[in-house]
């Protein structure tokens, strides 16, 4: 079984909705890193040197490769990444090797068989 790592940067107000969307699309879990900061193409506004941007969360999900595109597209739709500027970014990376995912792999085996 081969995996992808989905990485999502999103306004913290959308985290719960995106976690639900990922699970509904086949993800078996998610790790959330709170209070991330960043800057996009447009420089953020500041007030006396302090950024006024909303806090971001980083969502990390290891998913089976055959399910990754469907999950990524569902995240895009729920998060409105392509329709509203500045709402978030999601991408996937290849996972060369992983340990500690035996339970997820067992659950995913049935879902992947249906998918392919």
Model-predicted regions and their roles:
Residues 1-116:
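Positively charged, small/polar-rich N-terminal and surface patches that mediate targeting and assembly
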